[in-house]
Amino acid sequence: MAVKRICIFPCGGMKKVESTVARIASYIVNEDLLPGKTMLMCVPAFLRGVEEDILMVENNPTVVIDCHEESCGSGLMALIGIPPAARIYIPDVVSQTGLIPGRNRQVLDLVGERLAQEVARCVAKAAQWMLEDQYYSFEKRKVKAFNQNLCEFSDEAIDLLDYVQVEPAIYRPKSMPPLWD
């Protein structure tokens, strides 16, 4: 099925500047780089079962932005049984570029903004590929039933995604269609 829109799921990490970087990067993609072609996942609405948010993830490829080794975004996707189409891993962006997240969580400082721009570039690259490549094929999937332990995931859940590195900081689960790899 041809891809018309991409869902972006930024990490919502508590007390981590990188989570602010992830959220700002997702807004940069949504508003500036690919306006009208992306949607932002709202985790609280998703967890409450808001139909619009559930359908967004089921009917569109999702790019997860994980901001730290806990990989909360990937973990949630693994638990609901829908692998993300792509994953951007902020620690890899940091090590690749030398950019740092900065210190301010509420409003990013200049160095944090630069990192957010670079993360947004990675997200947009993956999203643009899925939107434009005529051979990229996305199959709709159904969310597994929610349970009380939804947020109690382990590394095993993330390991099940079996990520393949496409290029520095950009990954996809082995089970998902190739990007440009």
Label each region the model flagged:
Residues P61-C67:
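Acidic beta-strand-to-loop metal/phosphate-binding motif
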Residues M1-M39, V50-P61, G73-D181:
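Iron-sulfur (Fe-S) cluster-binding modules
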